[in-house]
Amino acid sequence: MASSKELCSIREWAPLTEVIERIPARLQRGFFPANLNLTCVDATEEFLAMGSDAGIVFWYNRHTGEMQKLKAEVATRITCVRVVNSVEYMVAAGCANGQVSIFQIQKELPRDLDLVAPCTKSRPIERYTIRDLHKCVVSCCEWSKNGMKLYSGDRQGVVVLTELDYQAHLSKSVEILSEAYEIVQLSVRQSYLLVATLYRCIVCQMDAQTSQWNITQVGKKDRKQLIDCGAIFLKKQEANKPQLVCGRPGLRFWVADAAGNVSKTVIFRDAVLRSPTWEIPILNPKQRSEPSGTHHTSASTSSTRHSGLADGDVGYVASSNFRQLYLYDGHDSLLVTHDDATLYVLNLDRLKVEAVARGLRKILDFCVCGKEIFVLEGNRTLLRLAPLPEPPNKTAKVIFNPLMPPPVPVLGSHLSQLESPIELQAEPVLQNAEECFELSPVEQLNLNVPIEIAVESPLTQQNRRLEIFRRIGEMDFEQSIVHTTRKTSVGKPPEASGVGIVEIGHETHELRLPLTNAATLMEASYCQMENNGLASPLDMKAAFLQHLPDALSPTTLQKTVAEKAKTLAAELDLPEVHLAPLSQEELHAVQAQTPQISDPLIRCYPTHLEEASIQTSSRENATNPADDYHVGEPVDGIRSFGVSKRKMAPLKFVLSQPKPTLKLEENRDDEEYTSFLPDFRRAGDPLAIHKETPATSDSNTSSEWEFLDN
């Protein structure tokens, strides 16, 4: 049996954040995302199984920190989950639609069989689905010890037995019991099945000869009210029949045998009102509403509340009945049960509450694995209560609460040490010498102080610390300390604060430009790495301007262009180019070598936008109705148009074979430049009288004509 010292060391050592963080907070259901909530929990020494309202069982490995998803056939709420450690891990999950999904998970080979591991073939997870037997929500399920049989019960009182054949991969299900009320809890011991309903508790045994189930009611008195009390088999036996304990109204228990004979009645009404042996500390307890002017310690609080209770009231009990029952560490005398928001560890032999956890907000489900108690407090809150902290795995970090007092050491327990003690070896003495040390000052002890005041109990110390945190939580702080809002100017850079506050997750030496938006930010420069190899964010303007010279300095610009010219000449094997301003003599020499163009030729080119434009329609104010040959008409084959009726000019064609030389007639008064291009002199004054353009060719074949590419 577990000693009282071991029970007094039960506490919540660290939050299970590593487990909860691996479960997604939201899940896509149809077109809209929804929150993912946990509904039930079960545990073994190596794994945790957590059901959810999305039809997924989360299978968490406590040694490696890995998380797997076991999906049911239908994505509906999982109401109960049970795990058995047999040849393989068997996980049963009851759903709200009446289906039961069974998952068969292969075990890993032990370390001494690592040589055989490459020869074996890992099998995938297999799923069996039980349909059409449960018509409503499955309330509970229970495995046999070898994992070959599964018993499941629903809210209509139907109990179904499922037998599994792992070799043939078959399952056979049959209905064995139909009660009138909801099944609360199931317990299996050898060939006996203990069924606890809202109305009564019965024992079922299968006859090997007739294959019929014999039903026996526990006790002769029926319940006067419908309560959801559980029942469980004990390990001890009398006359080759297992013993059982079942709950009764009014915080009572019946201890009976498999034949239904009640041996004794255990009442815990007075024991619950008394102060428990140990109050389990919780990291984030719920603040209890207390009477005004009451400052409590562990002893004064219990005595005050016990004396102030009226007749028929129960102290901390939210309801006057216990719920499901489990054995603590396999001991028959220690029961773990709960009500709405309080967890109890009861001692049946001493009629005493060994430990109690009162700081829970709500208990959705709980399970017991040896000396560990896992409590599902909320939709995403899982607590672990144990005398020792969780052993570290490959990914999780062990977080101890420094505010909690150290637990009482359990002497003689094999779990009292997480690691083997370090063996100290004597070091060889290099040289004998005398060590000098300073004596501490001698302090006088006051022997008149009583022992009760000098030694503070762990429970009193814990309550005192909880009172300090409660007072801190009730203090009224300014909201601006927690939530600050400030507006930064767009035109001015942010001023550096001298207070020394560093924002978590940001670098303090990062350069921020005020006129840079998010679209122009770059992750890092391709040519520059800062912060010891880490890329610092730069904006595009700063990334390019840091390599450019000052545009306002002519000297710097001239040097930069000269270097560029030398580099280009070296790459292209060109003679070296010297960039320098031209002198007046060189400028006059260049102007002297440039041929002078006559003034009439210069006037041929248009100098204004109106002169260079092409006219495509008739002009109403035209004074000279002479033909215009440069407004889109072909050079050859010109037709004369009347003054009164003017049409649009057809497409313009030009001879593709121009004369080989260009001639400039100098003897004529009106100098004319002949070329294959249009006469730009006519563009200067379209209303002037021009001579008839001579024909350029006698042939009008299509091979000599092409479109003019303007």
Swiss-Prot record:
The keyword Transmembrane does not apply. The keyword Repeat applies. Residues 613-624, 694-704 have a biased composition (Polar residues). The modification Phosphoserine is found at residue 553. Transmembrane segments: none annotated. Keywords: Phosphoprotein, Repeat, WD repeat. Belongs to the WD repeat KIAA0329 family. This is WD repeat-containing protein CG11141.
